[in-house]
């Protein structure tokens, strides 16, 4: 039987993998995505819940293509705070068998005219509620399960939506496995459909500036989602969404460039020695070859690329040991790098579940099933859609905490500089400037035209958690078109904020 060129390439790839694996003496589970998914999630103390089947008792149903939303005052808030303009709801996805997307919507503490911002947490398969309560939401959870106001919450300056975008993540669920998404096309179409219904529900916000934000695997979600919104606007498909820009924090966007940067970053940060660097770099050529086969198809070759290229990261982690790969300044305590267990406890409270309308639907912080379903999407290059957005004037901010290993600033900076667009040469020639917050350097900024890159000091993977004030200032200046300004205009005090 004749061998097709693609099959021959895959066979060659497997041979290269075997040779490189022998040279590296990798651990037995180094190339198996299931084992890695479980290890990554356990390291974050985010154990996946059981698969959800059907509508949970007490959860409100909603017709396909419709949105069911309620105003929310969460238990644990101080008494007498009044109506905060907080909402929670489900969107019943059309063109699915039984999928429902969960979201929070927090109106701005400032003005109704503030921009509408949507936040997407990555994973893939991790809930945006992690950001609500640990990063940039209105409040954090105290150990006694009370809620403490976050004075740097992004709702201070925006009307912000937090969505669990993939079925099986957070409180989003379906009774039918066929609703599981495997690529960005499915996720971005779901999000676009959600926005169409959301703005019909909230027409008072439809003319506001709109920005897409997120971190980690949202480096895949966001470019595809932004392109979907932009194309929908161009084709007059429905309600015009006033997309002005998007921001990706410590994202995975161009794997071919970012995986190659792992060893350089690890060596620069003294995580590995030069001999380790030379040895692990033997995996880079087969990784590059595998990604080339993958292209932008998201097929079986992309799974092979995932297995090959993650051997680079796994080999580094074998040497790094107990260090936190989301923040290399820190050690993981045992198997746990961060403890988000208060979130599980909070959502286990019956009063909380009744308040947000989820009934007994099980909350899943991070889902291994969603992670595995997206594996063929992992090594795809999502940078390819960004130049067209830049050319049409959509503002793009790529930011990265300097101490993150897994989606490090070096790899992000390299793909940003390598991106081909009309301003590429001028961007490369632009001098870096200090990003100042309270007259102190909070980061280093490079900006030209619609493109900006910000390296954030003293932060790891989750910049809004590590540097909340700098993150809020970043959002303020980005959404106001003043990112290059060192000192923002004084924010007028509001009676509302003073009251809380």
From Swiss-Prot:
The active site is at 216, 404, 461. GO terms for molecular function: serine-type carboxypeptidase activity. It catalyses: Release of a C-terminal amino acid with broad specificity. It comes from the Eukaryota. One of its GO terms (cellular component) is vacuole. Its EC number is 3.4.16.5. InterPro entries: AB_hydrolase_fold, Peptidase_S10, Ser_caboxypep_his_AS, Ser_caboxypep_ser_AS. Belongs to the peptidase S10 family. The lineage of its organism: Eukaryota, Viridiplantae, Streptophyta, Embryophyta, Tracheophyta. The keyword Hydrolase applies. Keywords: Carboxypeptidase, Disulfide bond, Glycoprotein, Hydrolase, Protease, Signal, Zymogen. Monomer. Glycans are attached at residue 144. One of its GO terms (biological process) is proteolysis. PANTHER family: SERINE CARBOXYPEPTIDASE-LIKE 48, SERINE PROTEASE FAMILY S10 SERINE CARBOXYPEPTIDASE. This is Serine carboxypeptidase 3. Disulfide bonds join 126-366, 294-309, 332-337. Induction: By gibberellic acid (GA). Substrate binds at residue 407. Residues 22-73, 485-500 form a propeptide. The keyword Protease applies. Residues 1-21 form the signal peptide.
């Amino acid at each position: 039987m004749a061998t097709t060129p693609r099959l021959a390439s895959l066979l060659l790839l497997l041979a290269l993998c075997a040779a490189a694996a022998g040279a590296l003496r990798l651990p037995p589970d180094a190339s198996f995505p299931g084992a890695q998914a479980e290890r990554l999630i356990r390291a974050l103390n985010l154990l996946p819940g059981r698969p959800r089947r059907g509508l949970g008792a007490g959860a409100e149903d909603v017709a396909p293509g419709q949105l069911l939303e309620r105003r929310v005052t969460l238990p644990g808030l101080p008494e007498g705070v009044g109506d905060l303009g907080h909402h929670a709801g489900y969107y019943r996805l059309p063109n699915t068998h039984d999928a429902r997307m969960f979201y929070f919507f927090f109106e701005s503490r400032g003005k109704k005219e503030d921009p509408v911002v949507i936040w997407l947490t990555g994973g893939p398969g991790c809930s945006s509620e992690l950001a609500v309560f640990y990063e940039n939401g209105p409040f954090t959870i105290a150990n006694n399960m009370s809620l403490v106001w976050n004075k740097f919450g992004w709702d201070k300056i925006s009307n912000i939506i937090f969505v669990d975008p993939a079925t099986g993540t957070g409180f989003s669920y379906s009774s039918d496995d066929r609703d599981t998404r495997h690529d960005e096309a499915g996720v971005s179409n779901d999000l676009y459909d959600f926005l169409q219904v959301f703005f019909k529900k909230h027409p008072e916000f439809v003319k506001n500036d709109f920005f897409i934000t997120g971190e980690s695997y949202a480096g895949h979600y966001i470019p595809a989602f932004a392109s979907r919104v932009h194309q929908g606007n161009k084709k007059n498909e429905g309600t015009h969404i006033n997309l002005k820009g998007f921001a990706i924090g410590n994202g995975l966007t161009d794997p071919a460039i970012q995986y190659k940067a792992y060893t350089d970053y690890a060596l620069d940060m003294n995580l590995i020695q030069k001999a380790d660097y030379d040895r692990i770099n033997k995996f880079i050529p087969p990784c590059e070859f595998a990604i080339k086969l993958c292209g932008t198809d998201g097929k079986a070759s992309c799974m092979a690329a995932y297995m090959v290229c993650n051997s680079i990261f796994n080999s580094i982690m074998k040497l790094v040991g107990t260090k936190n790969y989301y923040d290399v300044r820190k050690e993981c305590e045992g198997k746990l790098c961060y403890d988000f267990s208060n979130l599980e406890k909070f959502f286990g409270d019956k009063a909380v579940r009744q308040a947000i309308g989820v009934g007994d639907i099980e909350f899943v912080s991070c889902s291994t099933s969603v992670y595995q379903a997206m594996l063929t999407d992992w090594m795809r290059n999502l940078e390819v859609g960004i130049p067209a957005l830049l050319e049409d004037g959509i503002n793009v901010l790529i930011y990265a905490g300097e101490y993150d290993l897994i989606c490090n600033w070096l790899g992000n900076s390299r793909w940003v500089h390598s991106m081909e667009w009309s301003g590429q040469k001028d961007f490369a020639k632009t001098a870096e400037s200090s990003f100042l917050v309270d007259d102190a350097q909070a980061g280093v900024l490079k900006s030209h035209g619609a493109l900006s890159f910000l390296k954030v000091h003293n932060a790891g993977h989750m910049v809004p958690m590590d540097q909340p004030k700098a993150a809020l200032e970043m959002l303020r200046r980005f959404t106001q078109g003043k990112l290059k300004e060192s000192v923002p205009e004084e924010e007028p005090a509001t009676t509302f904020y003073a009251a809380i």
